[in-house]
């Protein structure tokens, strides 16, 4: 069933129909289309298009259809309807006869699909917020269990300064907190109802759109009909949110892939999230993490594709805008799946504390401590920086750690160095000194964990 046809003297070519139809993907909007239709039926009562009895009959039929859809959403795909709006109307007419043909009075598919998609986005945001929060909780739990796991921190993938595995977990917790905030901001902007804007110029019936918005669960109604049916900012924003969130998860995955490697061996992943090789029996591959990293690209691609689709469109609705759904559906599904999988990875992770500490003690990660020591003795920092660089070269030549160099050797570089330098160069001292807010000292990490728990409460 098509919702148009009187203007045409020939049937659509079957190849065009397959190219044009969107039911194969927009069937996912079925529940939202039904909910929007129930709201619209109530609005039509207020302008005397429907009687109370007719509206109740329509609502009853739509609710029955909603139950069917919730039980088996993929049954919709058996239809040859053009889109989800056509399918709902066709099924409604089957249930209530000609009364079903009155429902679309004053409504266009342009404001209808905009409403459906926003309602769907609101549902998805609620689910994503829950998934993000669950992963934040998993990171905090993992951090709390690994406050004493000292490991190298890196810049340029070179050992830089010692940190803890807990501090690393909390870094990703902060990224996810921003992801959550972005989703909440996106929701504020999209929470306005398009219904009642018609094709582009507004409906010809004196509908109270604010009342209608309330019935549908929106905060308010949109203010300009032309903008409303043209607007897909919320799609771009959600794709941007997903893209940034997936970048965070991809970096999380890359870190753990390295930490899990034989070269680092800081962690071991659970058998539940790894796989083997068909040839090499010793292999335990971090497939879950590699897939998280790999799937990041498809989400970025969806955002780029949507921006390119919209960039040259004149106002108002154009069929190009049908391309807003497949990329969005896939991107949000992917983000949700990756959030879940990241949490599963954390559930079974084992941190190898001795190996982490051994690595943290290598690579001259305490060099900055020696420079700070010299500054405390009155040496200008830039000069201290140069002195320590020379001392590191000597330590490398001798094949020793800085703290293993004899005092006499250290004093060759600066006479102010004394026996009190050795406690300063100890690994625990390196951590303890980073006691400013956000630092890696045990006290600050414990405080950050407590703060994160309060924010999640």
UniProtKB/Swiss-Prot annotation:
It catalyses: 2-(N(omega)-L-arginino)succinate = fumarate + L-arginine. GO terms for molecular function: argininosuccinate lyase activity. GO terms for cellular component: cytosol. GO terms for biological process: arginine biosynthetic process via ornithine; L-arginine biosynthetic process. Pathway: Amino-acid biosynthesis; L-arginine biosynthesis; L-arginine from L-ornithine and carbamoyl phosphate: step 3/3. Its EC number is 4.3.2.1. It is found in: Cytoplasm. Pfam families: ASL_C2, Lyase_1. NCBIfam families: argH, PRK12308.1. This is Argininosuccinate lyase. It comes from Pectobacterium carotovorum subsp. carotovorum (strain PC1).
